[in-house]
């Protein structure tokens, strides 16, 4: 008996999309290959709060929306970038609670 497992669209649990102009290249490639991605927060400056994570996620989705690729609209409908915080000595418990309650932080 043959059993098969088909991954229709995998997830990437450790991706570095970078920021700024690089998003125009990295985001469309990631959106075509993956359904969900966990975006590493080690940008410059690092993503350390829920507010920064939300802004970074918006830049990621905007980069996909602004891309000139033909299937950008379809990709936007299914691409789900999940955010994490870069923890530092200054990260407060409240920062973590706020991020956890934001709905966008993995």
Language-model segments: which ranges?
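Structured loop/turn residues at beta-strand edges in well-structured enzyme cores
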Residues: 5-8, 32, 102-103
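Divalent metal-dependent hydrolysis catalytic cores, especially in the metallo-beta-lactamase
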Residues: 13, 27-52, 75-88, 104-106
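Short beta->alpha connector loops
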Residues: 19-22, 87-91
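Alpha-helical structural signal in soluble globular domains
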Residues: 33, 59-63, 102
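Metal-dependent catalytic neighborhoods of phosphoester/phosphodiester hydrolases
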Residues: 48-56, 93-94
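Alpha-helix-loop-beta-strand connector modules within alpha/beta enzyme cores
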Residues: 54-68, 72-76
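Extended substrate/RNA-proximal surfaces in nucleic-acid metabolism proteins
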Residues: 91-106
């Amino acid at each position: 008996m043959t059993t098969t497992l088909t991954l229709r669209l995998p997830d990437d649990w450790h991706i570095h999309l970078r920021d700024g102009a690089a998003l125009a290249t990295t985001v469309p490639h990631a959106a075509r290959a993956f359904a969900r991605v966990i975006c590493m927060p080690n940008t410059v400056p690092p993503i350390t709060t829920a507010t920064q994570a939300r802004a970074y996620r918006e830049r990621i989705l905007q980069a996909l929306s602004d891309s000139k690729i033909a299937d950008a609209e379809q990709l936007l409908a299914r691409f789900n970038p999940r955010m994490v915080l870069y923890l530092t000595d200054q990260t407060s418990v409240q920062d973590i609670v706020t991020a956890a309650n934001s709905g966008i932080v993995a």
